[in-house]
């Protein structure tokens, strides 16, 4: 388990490129036949990926020991979105078939967590966010057909994008975790611009659906102290509540967003005008 400490905004603005990447970038999300796990002190979120190829992958009691409990979800909830091939997640003996861009919410108290791919040649890529939970909500599958996509932006400003809200109060109940998927229209490059912060939540982005010769310049930092991190395909970045989180790519891309904190109202944002950025 890779543990990342919280960092003050005054400290963050003094960091060079390598130090920024070390603090906020998660480079290796998917490793064949393993799970990856990054524990952030910021709102205690855990971020990672699971890619079963030659055999199922189980998250067992070995993780619980690192968290001071018996199992991962003794005091946590889990959200998973599959950005790879078809697969399944077995939760306490019950199999949930999870296709490409399907999602599964798993509530507090689940013990058995096994992840499988249908085809080794096109393995599932289960990306997950895990947050502290105070009560147990039912495990539930959410498919793209279950969410009402919202299209924002304009081709003229190169930010036309479709937002799919998977885990929000209108779709299902969670303790604090919100997750969704945003896809840029072809030829569009900007996400979340004009940008915002939200004092009551932190956020993690996973960028994917990117070609090998493309990248995203992820903007972060306080609005008057902006920095950037260069992102490649299937990499994630941690955004503290004091930081903007926006990006511009060399080509269109898709990203999964996940938020934890005290407020699940999606529009609870502190907007920043473009002319106020530095």
Curated annotation (Swiss-Prot):
The keyword Zinc applies. Pathway: Glycan metabolism; pectin degradation; 2-dehydro-3-deoxy-D-gluconate from pectin: step 4/5. Zn(2+) binds at residues 196, 198, 203, 245. SUPFAM superfamilies: RmlC-like cupins. Pfam families: KduI (PF04962). Its EC number is 5.3.1.17. One of its GO terms (biological process) is D-galacturonate catabolic process. The keyword Membrane does not apply. Its cofactor is Zn(2+). It catalyses: 5-dehydro-4-deoxy-D-glucuronate = 3-deoxy-D-glycero-2,5-hexodiulosonate. Keywords: Isomerase, Metal-binding, Zinc. GO terms for molecular function: 4-deoxy-L-threo-5-hexosulose-uronate ketol-isomerase activity; metal ion binding; zinc ion binding. Transmembrane segments: none annotated. Binds 1 zinc ion per subunit. PANTHER family: 4-DEOXY-L-THREO-5-HEXOSULOSE-URONATE KETOL-ISOMERASE (PTHR38461:SF1). Belongs to the KduI family. Catalyzes the isomerization of 5-dehydro-4-deoxy-D-glucuronate to 3-deoxy-D-glycero-2,5-hexodiulosonate. This is 4-deoxy-L-threo-5-hexosulose-uronate ketol-isomerase. It comes from Salmonella typhimurium (strain LT2 / SGSC1412 / ATCC 700720).
């Amino acid at each position: 388990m890779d543990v990342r400490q919280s960092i003050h905004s005054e400290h963050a603005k003094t960091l060079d490129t390598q130090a920024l990447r070390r603090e906020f970038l998660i480079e290796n999300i998917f490793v064949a036949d393993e799970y990856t796990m990054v524990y952030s002190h910021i709102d205690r979120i855990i971020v990672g990926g699971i890619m079963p190829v030659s055999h199922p992958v189980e998250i067992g009691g070995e993780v619980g020991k690192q968290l001071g409990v018996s199992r991962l979800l003794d005091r946590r909830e889990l959200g998973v979105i599959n950005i790879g091939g078809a697969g399944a997640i077995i939760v306490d003996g019950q199999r949930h078939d999870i296709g490409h861009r399907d999602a599964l919410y798993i509530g507090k108290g689940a013990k058995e967590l096994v992840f499988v791919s249908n085809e080794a040649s096109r393995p599932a890529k289960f990306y997950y966010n895990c947050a502290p939970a105070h009560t147990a909500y039912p495990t539930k599958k959410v498919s793209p057909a279950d969410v009402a996509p919202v299209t924002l932006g304009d081709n003229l400003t190169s930010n036309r994008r479709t937002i799919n809200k998977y885990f929000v109060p209108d779709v299902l109940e969670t303790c604090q975790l919100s997750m969704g998927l945003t896809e840029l229209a072809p030829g569009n490059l900007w996400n979340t611009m004009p940008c915002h912060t939200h004092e009551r939540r932190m956020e993690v982005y996973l960028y994917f659906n990117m070609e090998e010769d493309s990248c995203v310049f992820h903007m972060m930092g306080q609005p008057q102290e902006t920095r950037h991190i260069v992102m490649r395909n299937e990499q994630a970045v941690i955004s503290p509540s004091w930081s903007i989180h926006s990006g511009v790519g060399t080509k269109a891309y898709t990203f999964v967003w996940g938020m934890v904190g005290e407020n699940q109202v999606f529009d609870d944002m502190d907007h920043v005008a473009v002319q106020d950025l530095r």
